[in-house]
Amino acid sequence: MVSHRHLSMKSALALSLAIAAVPAASAATLELTLQDQARQRAIPIELSLPAAPCTKAPCPVALLSAGYGIGYKEYRFLVEELNRSGWLVVSVDHQLPTDAKLDRNEDVAPQLKTMRRRGVANLRFVQDSLSKSHPGYDWRHVTLIGHSLGGDISAERASEGDPTITRVVTLDNRRGALPRTAAVKVLSIRASDTQADPGVLPDAQEQKQYGACIVKLPGARHNDMYDGGPAELKAAIAKATQAFLVKNACEAAP
């Protein structure tokens, strides 16, 4: 377990050695719990390592945030695809057993706002901690990926103006406004059974101005965009994400 507000030299060395000791070709995973002492909060994470070593440049990094009520390790279909392309993927647990559950009998807007703010703080802490413990990865160009509430968290973090956040991928986020800036490349993959709140998605003019990519998947259900969803949907999500991250392309659904 990694502890303290900032990693100690001993903890950083231990984590670096643990990662380095894993054969790269195994695309192994490591489970850790970071401790944010300033907020008195534990942050469980899973590091999914690249399937092959990056020899020409540091491996790229993605921080992944799950949808509400879905386990943070239930996006293996996407994580493994990115691992095969040389990415380090850090899956972040924003939902601890001690956290208040969403009360749908009350106004959900302030509850979700609290969850988003907490998630944004989690992402900041995870990035700060891991960039110190294992600087061999590309922490200067981090991609954020998130589904539903995790997408809202990712969108809000990407909108803070941090120059180290350069891309964001959301799976049908509905409340956190996506960034409007050429400094952050945007891909948002949309389900067909939901609607985003006004102002969340860039309009046609903003998409053209900032190069944002909005991919609508016919027949896709919001709650199916994880490991438990149909194979065809997972393949479409992985294809669009890979095109965006690897080829810098915006590929619409067939």
Question: What is each of the regions a protein language model found here?
Answer:
Residues 2-6, 10-51:
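An N-terminal hydrophobic leader/cap segment in hydrolases
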Residues 33-137:
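Serine-hydrolase catalytic machinery in alpha/beta-hydrolase-like enzymes
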Residues 93-94, 216-218:
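Residue-level recognition of beta-strand->loop/alpha-helix junctions
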Residues 127-182:
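Primarily recognizes the serine-hydrolase "nucleophile elbow" in alpha/beta-hydrolase
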Residues 180, 195-201:
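Conserved alpha/beta-hydrolase "acid-adjacent" motif
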Residues 187-190:
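Short beta-strand/loop motif that positions the catalytic acidic residue
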Residues 220-233:
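Catalytic histidine-centered segment of alpha/beta-hydrolase-like enzymes
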Residues 246-254:
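Alpha/beta-hydrolase-fold serine-hydrolase catalytic core, especially in secreted/extracellular enzymes
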